[in-house]
Amino acid sequence: MTNNQTDRPRPPGPESRRFDNNDKNNRNRWGPIPSWAWIVLIVALLLNWLVAPILFPEGKGAVSIPYTSFKQQLENNNVAEVTTQADKITGEFKQAVKVPGVDQPVKRFVTHIPAFGDDQLMSQLDQKGVIVNVQPESSTRSLLLSILISFGPTILFFLLFLWLISKAQSSQQGLFGLGKSRAKRYNATESTRVTFDDVAGIEEAKQELAEIVDFLKNPQKYQRLGGTIPKGVLLIGPPGTGKTLLARAVAGEAGVPFFSMSGSEFVEMIVGVGAARVRELFQQAKKEAPCIIFVDELDAIGRRRGSSINVGGHDEREQTLNQLLVEMDGFDSRQGVIVLAATNRPDVLDPALLRPGRFDRRVVVQRPDKVGRLKILQVHTRNVPLDPNLDLSEIAAATPGLVGADLRNLVNEAALLAARRGKNYVDREDFFDALEKITLGAERKLLISEEDRRRVAYHESGHALLGLLLPEADPVHKVTIIPRGQALGVTYQTPEDDRYNYTERYLRSRITAALGGRAAEELVFGTVTTGAENDLKQVTEIARQMVTRWGMSKEVGLVYLSPDGQEDFLGPNPITSREYSESLATVIDRETRRIIDECYAEALSLLNRERQRLDNLAEALLREESLDEQQIREIVGLGEKQPEPA
């Protein structure tokens, strides 16, 4: 079935219009020179003529003196050297002399021979032993050269100025092209086309956007019943989940032009440039309809008006936002121009931008679950030779919390490791080594003392042992005392499945296991070190959220005390105002301390009771440096881990 929409001749785009009326454009490339431009040139030349003698006086550093003063100093044998050029004499005194009208004594001078001449001057100079230099009179060529030196820069600057004006008039974008849109246009060709098959792990988001694709392919299907497609679709989600890729897939599936621009590219230092770029972008899109406009990082221009405390760029950003609001609500939706935008800060967007008629549909792109991660890995390993025995579902299960960008990086790192090792395919070892490198950091060749190695071994053994003994704690997959990243040792714990709810018992187990390293140091050595800094940061964050967000403190009660609207996909905003009293803040601090102290006491108690297991695990770490989960269980005597019932 032939679609009438596709048979309609497309309006000429920028490429086809570029070579129209070529001869005419070449003949009138400079265009008419405005009358004010000639006034500017005349004023510039006059200023140059008046200022040049002041900036570049003849005889640099010389003072003009009367001829009689020169003759007097010559008689006093105070003239050291002179240079003559026609009737002009420049020279230098042996000793500086006081000249009427000049505050400072004069050493270099300039004077002129009277019109009636002085026949005795040369003999007097020779008699006094004055060094005489002669310069020829200026020729016609040197005069022209002097004129070019004086007026040439001004003329060149004026010609450059006229060229800029002509370019600005021909492009109709203002001087220097500041108002021109910087949107990049992508035409869906077979070599660069992105489809929904290239996007995996976010099936719900793809289903939401399938209607947009259907509208671009079959607009009459909706228009015949009076329906209109949403003018704006806002993609919301954490960084790396595939929002930009999803937008390009929509354009690839629909087979229409795709204009992409970052929100930060609209705003410039000059007020009004952002609004001009918005207008130009939408004008260009209307000529290419049906098409898609994609604005990445919308929060750069879409922040709530009046909420910024910054002075610089504040008015410019608001003008750009106002123009965007007008354009989205000012053009006919039946023209087939759809605006997609992506952000991970939906809480800061202006309400007028989210109202029906603008960005009235919101698609949340969440982190993929285990099945989604498996599909993403299958997409990214299409062109990667894999070990036939490799099970990608095992890799997907070991990567909870990773998004599409992380998994793509994981596949690339695994392929690089396999190539470095001279393999012909990528196997399980390469994937897990790459995962450790990404999550834990690269191994460092760091020489540490035996005492520090022993402390690190007990510190990591405390983490690992409590991770095995505590109920609901995340499984321990690996422990090492090889320095990685900024840590001297690492205990790698990840949940077996994706978690969406946390019990209080689970959270306390996480705090207790995180404090196991500090507790082991105090128990074995009697002193503590700075090695638990990151552990203390983690447990403080968990305990405070238990008190302020999740209602797990009886004294504080069932209240939510974090500032409203200050958390998003990037985490809490540090610039917030506290919305509770000082007395309640004291209670929150006390309850946070209480939870941490109770968990630390439990960690000390468990490690003291299991001291033999702790010593065995630490000694094994000192020998092997790295232990996997099965080795840890055998050393502490817990036996092989039993699989969970299906």
Swiss-Prot record:
Q: Where does the record place the region Disordered?
A: 1-27
For activity, the cofactor(s) needed are: Zn(2+)
Q: Does the keyword Transmembrane apply?
A: yes
The residues responsible for catalysis, as annotated, are E460
Which GO molecular function annotations are given, in alphabetical order? ATP binding; ATP hydrolysis activity; ATP-dependent peptidase activity; metalloendopeptidase activity; zinc ion binding
How this chain sits in the membrane, per its record, is: Multi-pass membrane protein
Specify residue ranges for compositional bias: Basic and acidic residues. Answer: 7-26
Q: Where are the transmembrane segments?
A: 36-56, 145-165
Which coarse location class describes where this protein primarily resides? membrane
- According to the UniProt entry, what is the EC number of this protein? 3.4.24.-
Residue spans, topological domain Extracellular: 57-144
The record ties this protein, via InterPro entries, to: AAA+_ATPase, AAA_lid_3, ATPase_AAA_core, ATPase_AAA_CS, FtsH, P-loop_NTPase, Pept_M41_FtsH_extracell, Peptidase_M41
Q: Cofactor binding mode, per the note?
A: Binds 1 zinc ion per subunit.
Q: Cite the record's note on assembly.
A: Homohexamer.
Extract the HAMAP family matched here: FtsH
Indicate the family of this protein: In the central section; belongs to the AAA ATPase family. In the C-terminal section; belongs to the peptidase M41 family.
Described function: Acts as a processive, ATP-dependent zinc metallopeptidase for both cytoplasmic and membrane proteins. Plays a role in the quality control of integral membrane proteins.
Its name, as the record gives it, is ATP-dependent zinc metalloprotease FtsH
The scientific name of the source species is Thermobaculum terrenum (strain ATCC BAA-798 / CCMEE 7001 / YNP1)
Q: By which gene is this protein encoded?
A: ftsH
